[in-house]
Amino acid sequence: MIRDLTVEDVPAIIALARVMSEEAGPLLHAERTSYILSSILGLDTVFAQGDVREDGCRSMLIGEISEHPFLNAVFAQELVIYTHPDYRGGIGAVKLIKSFTSWAEEKNVDYIKLEATAGINNDRTSKLFSRLGYNSAGFLAFYPVRGELWQQHQL
């Protein structure tokens, strides 16, 4: 069931983030992530929803609203969107993106940003974003200073 995520969900979020980290690369810092989530979940400028079932969190989208430092514009941007491999192909991610989009529109933002940067089905994810009305904008580049962190990425 898709619902708002709360501080009580942090262990389930971290468990899903571990799966994401195993798939995308060893990037998770569980203690820091838990601390940050405990601080931001429930804030008016933070969107956090997930498909949470008895067996854990299957899918999540967490985003935030912020003013752009150089533009006269307010952005809603996702911080993470991820679906457990066992539950891909369903409608969970679609529902989360639509909910995030509606939330951001209600917050009267100027732009909404979604990214596919984990190296997990980036093409498929990009097509999903496009089907939901999002347009490709620009180019995102990574420079791996610590290359071992990005060994699994096909960026």
Model-predicted segments: where are they?
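Short amphipathic alpha-helix that is part of the acyltransferase structural core
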Residues: 1-30
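Conserved N-terminal entry element of GNAT/NAT acetyltransferase domains
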Residues: 1-8, 147-155
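A conserved beta-strand-loop-helix scaffold within acyl/acetyltransferase catalytic domains
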Residues: 26-48, 61-71
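Glycine-rich phosphate/pyrophosphate-binding loop shared by adenosine-nucleotide-utilizing enzymes
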Residues: 54-60, 76
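A short, internal acetyl-CoA/4′-phosphopantetheine-binding micro-motif in the GNAT/acyltransferase core
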Residues: 79-89
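Conserved acyl-CoA
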Residues: 95-111
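Conserved beta-strand-loop-alpha-helix junction that forms the acyl-donor binding cleft
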Residues: 113-124
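Conserved catalytic-core motifs of GNAT/GCN5-like acyltransferases
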Residues: 115-117, 135-147
